[in-house]
Amino acid sequence: MALKKVKGNFFERMFDKNLTDLVRGIRNNKDNEAKYISTCIEEIKQELRQDNISVKCNAVAKLTYIQMLGYDISWAGFNIIEVMSSSRFTCKRIGYLAASQCFHPDSELLMLTTNMIRKDLNSQNQYDAGVALSGLSCFISPDLSRDLANDIMTLMSSTKPYLRMKAVLMMYKVFLRYPEALRPAFPKLKEKLEDPDPGVQSAAVNVICELARKNPKNYLPLAPIFFKLMTTSTNNWMLIKIIKLFGALTPLEPRLGKKLIEPLTNLIHSTSAMSLLYECINTVIAVLISISSGMPNHSASIQLCVQKLRILIEDSDQNLKYLGLLAMSKILKTHPKSVQAHKDLILACLDDKDESIRLRALDLLYGMVSKKNLMEIVKRLLGHMERAEGSAYRDELLYKVIEICAQSSYLYVTNFEWYLTVLVELIQLEAGSRHGRLIAEQLLDVAIRVPVVRQFAVNEMTNLLDTFTVSAQSNSMYEVLYAAAWIVGEFAGELEDAEKTLNILLRPRLLPGHIQGVYVQNVIKLFARLATTCLELQDLPGLVTLCDHVLDKLQHFNGSSDIEVQERANSACMLIEMLRNQLSTSTDAMAMDTTTEGGIPPLAIEIVQEMTLLFTGELIPVAPKAQRKVPLPDGLDLDEWINAPPPEDAASSSSSEHDKDELFVSATQAGTGADGGEKRRQSLELTPEQLERQRMARLIEQSNNPHYLKSTPTASGASNADQYDNIDDIPITELPLDMEGVAALRVGITKRSDKYLQEQQAAQGSKDGKKKHKKGKKSKKAKNKVAYNSSSESEGEPKPLHIVNTTLDMPEGVSMSDSEDKDGKYDPNDPHRALDIELDITEFEAPAVRSASKKSAADKENLKTPADLAGGGNAAKKDRKKDKDKDKERKVKREHRESKRERKEAAVQPVIDLIDADTPTPSPSHISATSNNNNTSTVLPDAPKHHKKKKNKEKTTDEAPDALATATGSSIIDVGGEEASEVASKVHKKKHKKEKSQRKEKKKASESASVSAIVSIGDYEQPLGISTPSKEIL
């Protein structure tokens, strides 16, 4: 019977599909893969219902592969747990593999796996425990971490290195899910740093380095152990981790950096591993940044790092080149001159085929700019922009050009005419750029901040408004028209020909609504400027002609589909019509007394003057934080609706397409007579001259549009001449350009900015020539003197021609502040935040400082009892009591600060001393001498009562009797008699007892220190008997 059952299972399994068959079937059914997989899933469900664990294991293996293809297998969670609990290792391994892919920390089925995983962790077979640790690391939850933390910590002490290594690595995941486990597990984790197995040691280093990545200050006392590992280990990957850790610890303790410079420099010289070299350079940079003020002779280390980074950048490997540029940018922040010497190499990286290399080189150029080389660098970038392929990289180049020039409030721009020319060139080069708004902001900012350059700016903006090509590509670049129109209107007094600029703004164009609105607004400014000129010249006919011309041109803005443009145009028309009506009466009343000498009515003059007052005054930039600093009035709720929105049902029932059309038509055709429907009817019946004018405008616009297919030229030249009678009115830059024309145009544009560069180079050359001439005269007199070059780079930089106004507009009574809300700086969901735990590393701590300070404070409190007896009246006693209370508070605070500082130095000082010693352990004689010279007591684990005998306490107890005697002496003078003598005798007895107890404690401390030091000879760790060394050793 049993044989028949075995045969049946064998024949059934012979036709089962294994994982190989599944993969082969999926490859053969590429056209209907989903259908084939659904069939396989049904077969797998049938296999999971069988009792044979091998069949279930095969089914789970196939489910694991199907899950990798993106299919959900969460429905098989119970079957996966069943396979995980198998006693066979092959099945258990497949089960844990499926669980690591299917389960996650929030899975509800994990509560069923706690006892099973604990059983595997405590198994005698190391591979069962190993596979359990590997799988658990993928789906461990806070509950599993809490329940299994002790079992995993037990494995850290296993006799098998395989399990110790996995347990150490697993503890990091436990710490993230259950931070409370860090404190009890840390002593064992620290022991593994000196484990004889290199794999376990490397795992412990990895875990501590990951823990210290976010909270490095908690692991500063472990620096001696890591220093020993760094100088003795040959494992490059472990060295990289240790060096990264030192890079995080150095800013917290700059003295540590001075000890690291020499070994790191040796590693840089000796290592051939590029990864280790890069980490060494990174750490040296961090060290030099933290100790730059205390280590003047570090230029050699910087030069070494820069030379090694140049080797990385010149390497053919793109990854090394990128890392070299990245590290070079870190050096640039603190030592820019060292990096500027390699400017040619950085500029050469702009031609690299890898875009990430080019972008990293652009970031470096931002910090290499000076007043002397700004124009040259911008010229190189403009040349790269012409040759660059891809709109994204061209946009990044444009952004970097503006960022380089505008940094630190235009610190390096010496000629703003050159900068405005560059901005105009960027507009013409990058018609389809997405940075049009950025260029517009720069144009506005320069025109507002630099008053001297405004005349040049308005002329450039007039040309830009006249020659800007409207195309489908320039959606974002339309914003420059916004800036140009605002500049010519705001600073209309700087215009050479305001009437020409007014005609340019009134020219009909297909522009976005907000651009048309700015056009209308600045037309009013220019009109007010020209009207004021007519008043000054007493030119009545010119003023009438101006009003008629502007009223006629503003009519096409009245028909705009943008409601803002309509409102502004109608308001402008009404205002100008009022002025026109007043001027029309002046011709009939020329002989009356109500007119002035030139015939302009006084009311018309008042209208022009009031219109001019609307735009008087100078605008300054608004501070970025101005709006948030405006106080809200009481009772104002910014979230409340001004007008409550109508209900959705009412809005849907009352609105329809027909109603929308009626509203739109009534808005455009409302009114009759001279201003209403009559003009609308006239626009529908165009004269032949108007039709011809519109046709010519349409042909010119089509010729300017590069996306419009032009008609082929005909053989008849006369017809072309007739067709383009107004050819002289077409601006040259709006002509359709082929590739050769574009190249020629770009060359001509680039020469405009090159003119300023040539002038700067010529001026710099003349200065250099004068310096050489003076130096040649002085060289004959100073033959025997030491040469000293007093000229610095800043002296050779050109002086700025213009002054930038940095005043910002703020609300009244509000001042600028740099305080920012930093609540969003750190992620509240970061698990490392919970791991910021102060660990009890007793090897370097001084726990007795706080208790000593408390006791000394209590002693000093006792000293005040004699003083309370002094004084004649209640008022004097109260005053003295208040003064003494204040003194007591100040002393307690001072002692608390001193104890806190001494405790911190006690934790850090052994780190530096042990690293500086270069020996595993100090000699017993040295230990004894140190403890005796510093008058410190030892810290023994079996004698906790001595923990409070520290230097701070002894100093307090030594000084307290003297202070007490002084205070008592003064009290004796005041009190006098028997009461004073009793107080003095008590003080002398107390002082004698304290001195006797201190001598006994010092003797015991020196003996225990010698014994503990002798016991711990040969270990690198500092013995427990060693007290904190004094600062004099350092």
UniProtKB/Swiss-Prot annotation:
GO cellular component: AP-3 adaptor complex; axon cytoplasm; clathrin-coated vesicle membrane; cytosol; endoplasmic reticulum; endosome membrane; Golgi stack; Golgi-associated vesicle
Record localization: Cytoplasmic vesicle, Clathrin-coated vesicle membrane; Golgi apparatus
Keyword terms of this UniProt record: Cytoplasmic vesicle, Golgi apparatus, Membrane, Phosphoprotein, Protein transport, Repeat, Transport
Chain positions with Phosphothreonine modification: 687
Bilayer disposition of the protein: Peripheral membrane protein
Pfam family for this entry, one: AP3D1
Top-level taxon of the source organism: Eukaryota
Basic residues: compositionally biased ranges: 769-784, 986-1003
Subunit structure: Adaptor protein complex 3 (AP-3) is a heterotetramer composed of two large chains (delta and beta3), a medium chain (mu3) and a small chain (sigma3).
Similarity section: Belongs to the adaptor complexes large subunit family.
Protein name from the UniProt record: AP-3 complex subunit delta
Organism encoding this protein: Drosophila melanogaster (Fruit fly)
Gene: g
